[in-house]
Amino acid sequence: MCSISQLAARIGLLCAMVLPSICSAGPTAIVIHGGAGTIEREKMSAEVEARYRKTLAEAVSAGHRVLARGGRSQDAVIAAIVVMEDSPLFNAGRGAVFTNEGEVELDASIMLGEDLNAGAVTGVKKVRNPILLAERIMSNSPHVMLMGEGAEAFAKTQQLELVDNEYFHTERRRRQLEHVIARDQDLAAIEPVTDAYESRKFGTVGAVALDQQGNIAAATSTGGMTNKRFGRIGDSPIIGAGTYADNNACGISATGHGEYFIR
């Protein structure tokens, strides 16, 4: 089998996959994504490309290590997504896009194919890793989805790390917001130039994994749409739209135009 870095290079910058491997208990696999689309090479410097490849390789390796030691698929997808949430490169966690009010609001979800259990969170502003909160909602509450301040209050009871909203802010995302507001349109309508192009193509992160026990898990995390208003919620925290897993079918983590997926 080729190395993680070789594999990521072969299948493209925005998606990386560990090919199924055979072990005594059964095959395992993990797939990750860092947002919809692909970027033309002439629009990305070698330095920026290397940063994305490195982080994607770290993310997929983190998930693969969990599976290789016999761990659960849910822990594998969480491990992979935490790496991407902690990176300023993606529209999830640190480095996520700004709302019209100049804040970062985060969504995440996870679903298990074994029993169709799921957890989701939307509109949180202080939870460092929203995917960890989605998992706690699934595992430690009777609910499927929590939102906003209530979700953050639950996060405190779970001893999850809370941060100031400024932790998520990056200068690149602020410039993108200013550009969008100046043109009085949302990011989906911007022509593919400079930072606007990069942001349109890089975004929501996700992972799907199969563990040695044959269980599938899928998870997704995002900051949503640049310049979003009025509490807009996309597909990422919606079970069956942004995330889905069923051992009898497949695992899905979606990225793209959320309203279409929800419909």
Model-derived features: where do they sit?
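Bacterial N-terminal signal peptides
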Residues: 10-21
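N-terminal secretory signal peptides that target proteins for export/translocation
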Residues: 1-9
